[in-house]
């Protein structure tokens, strides 16, 4: 339906513009005989001005028409939404979203803090071995001594444990800063 109105309006403006242009020509140059095609125009600038004027008039009329169509469409949309107001209100209540900015930022900051605390607690409790308690793991390591390399294996295990303990203490003592 809109396209029919659009085409009809466009046709009316074209016909009106051509009538105005024809009337202007007859008013400015009243001739008793038709001009031949080979006859040169007296002033080419005058012809360009007429052409620009008619194009400007058409563009102006066309933009006014489009503005009025937009206004009509907007009024029609307002009337339709007023009629269906209850349906729209229910739909918006069902799918109402939370505020994007602050709520999401606060939740993500909270979740990051919780994840860091859980990771530190996991490191303190299990140090990577969830299956065995600390005492059982050390007793097993001492029971698996070999003649060659037992001292170096035992020493590296102790050093690893000390390094892990120092790292965990450092993590616990340093404050977690917020990302910005």
UniProtKB/Swiss-Prot annotation:
Protein origin, superkingdom: Eukaryota
Species this protein is from: Mus musculus (Mouse)
Entry's family note: Belongs to the glucagon family.
Gene coding for it: Gcg
Entry protein name: Pro-glucagon
Residues under site feature: Cleavage: 52-53, 83-84, 91-92, 97-98, 130-131, 145-146
Residues spanning the signal sequence: 1-20
UniProt keyword list: Amidation, Cleavage on pair of basic residues, Hormone, Phosphoprotein, Secreted, Signal
PANTHER family: GLUCAGON, PRO-GLUCAGON
GO molecular function list: hormone activity; identical protein binding; receptor ligand activity
């Amino acid at each position: 339906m809109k396209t029919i109105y659009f085409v009809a309006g466009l046709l009316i403006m074209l016909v009106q513009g051509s009538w105005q242009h024809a009337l202007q020509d007859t008013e400015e140059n009243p001739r008793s005989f038709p001009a031949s095609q080979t006859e040169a125009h007296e002033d080419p600038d005058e012809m360009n001005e007429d052409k620009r004027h008619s194009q400007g008039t058409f563009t102006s009329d066309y933009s006014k028409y489009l503005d009025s169509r937009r206004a009509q469409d907007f009024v029609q949309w307002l009337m339709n939404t007023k009629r269906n107001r209850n349906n729209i209100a229910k739909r918006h209540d069902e799918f109402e979203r939370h505020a994007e900015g602050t709520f999401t930022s606060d939740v993500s900051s909270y979740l990051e803090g919780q994840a860091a605390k859980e990771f530190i607690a996991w490191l303190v409790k299990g140090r990577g071995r969830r299956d065995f308690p600390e005492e059982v793991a050390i007793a097993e390591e001492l029971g698996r001594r070999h003649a060659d390399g037992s001292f170096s294996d035992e020493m590296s295990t102790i050093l690893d444990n000390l390094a892990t303990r120092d790292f965990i203490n450092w993590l616990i003592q340093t404050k977690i800063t917020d990302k910005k």
